[in-house]
Amino acid sequence: MLRLHAIPFSTNVERITLALAYKGLQCELVEHDPDDRSAILRLSGQELVPVLEDDGEVVSDSPLVLRHLERKYPQPPLWPTETARSAELDLFLDWFNRVWKRPPNAIADGIGGITEAAELRGSLGYFEALLAGRPFLFGGGFTAADATAFPFIKYGLVFDPADDEPFHRVLIEHLSFGDDHPRLTEWVRRVDAMPRAGDS
């Protein structure tokens, strides 16, 4: 069985639990104390989650884990089969991970301010436009784009009050939306209703 190492409220772990459930894969979810990641370090050589164990192979870093799952368990697919569309999705993932996440990280680290907050807030219109006439970010079906973005964007609409992670509090404060972004609101609720691996 697949084994996924996690900490509570991890956005990057939720990317993987969504993908696993979408692919119908069973996994054992192993939760670690955020303040003691020694077991994660021993297993993977680094302290970040998610870390996936799959038949003796250890994979860390959520984009790499998503790619691993797609390669080893290709159905149902998280990437379009068309070469051009698949490349477009890769560009979106790279933009989200390297560009979109920069402002909230800067704010959480105390080095960001008004400019970063405006960038973060301004990105909501981009997602609203992507969802015009379609239920998911890249069309009619769930893809790696939804798995990648949802765990972060959701904080503008839904969150657990017990989650006091500073980065997440930044998202709650600067991404709040509702009727002003109706398509985005529907998308968050649509993906939020999807199962996750490890759900009891």
Language model region names:
Residues 1-129, 135-137:
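GST-like domain detector, emphasizing the conserved glutathione-binding G-site
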Residues 96-190:
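GST-like fold's C-terminal all-alpha helical module
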